[in-house]
Amino acid sequence: SLGFKIMPLYIKDMSRDKIIAASTDGMMMSGRSPFIMQGWADMEKQEIEDIEKVLKSKGIKSELEVDIGLVPEIVTDRMKSCDILLIGKNEAITERIVSILKGNYKSIIFIGEKPLKRMEKVIIANDDGVKINRSCYQFTNLFPEVKEFTSFVINKEIEENHLIGYLEGKEKTITHEVLNTTDYNEVLKKIDEYDFFIMGNLSRSYFFEKIIGKNGIKLLEKSKTPIFIG
């Protein structure tokens, strides 16, 4: 109903094959690896069957493609033919997701607890930086039908917000506010009232930002609302 043509893709991750036990003298102990590999093969088969059932139940007629290789490399190659990468999101940024974020050159939508059903209420994390500006540029080109946005910044007055002016120049209606709070549960609660959340891409030092508790990591990991990063 949102007008997407979906290309479902399942990747059998070759990096799993690198997991193998080693003895104390450095000799490789591969005796148990066939059992491990068979267990993974059975799990992958079941996952593929489960995904195919879900696709069918959702009315998605596109055939699930199965590829084998390193996940970031395959994603990078497949995105040459696509506009947006759609990824399921847990409450943690894994190393695999970080690799995809670093290498991806197209827009990304993260889907967490809350499904993407409509785009009537869209909210922007607006610090007037270049990354959120780029995300909004990509979003408005991909979804020109969205005309109204809510914009917020946390504990920061911006005298001249260029992003607001940019969006208004594209005939968009913007409602902007400053959230004066140090409680990120309040911010998340507000975001989760919306259908879609636009944020800028994070810096390349994802895990360092996670350790020191940077705002973007918190919002990316904890938000239930679907997230768009351009």
Walk through the language-model features, giving the residues of each.
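Short, charged N-terminal beta->alpha structural module
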Residues: E49-K58, T94-E95, I158-L167
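Short beta->alpha linker loops
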Residues: V66, L70, E91-A92, K114, ...
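Intrinsically disordered or low-complexity boundary/linker segments at protein termini
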Residues: D77-V146, K222-G230
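Structural beta-alpha unit
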Residues: D13-R16, D25, P34-Q38, D42-L85, ...
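Short, well-ordered alpha-helical microsegments
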Residues: P72-E73, T94, I132-N133, E160, ...
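Small/aliphatic-rich secondary-structure junction motif
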Residues: S1-G31, G103, R118-L179, K190, ...
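Short, highly selective alpha-helical patches that border small-molecule cofactor pockets
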Residues: E44, I48, I97, S135-C136, ...
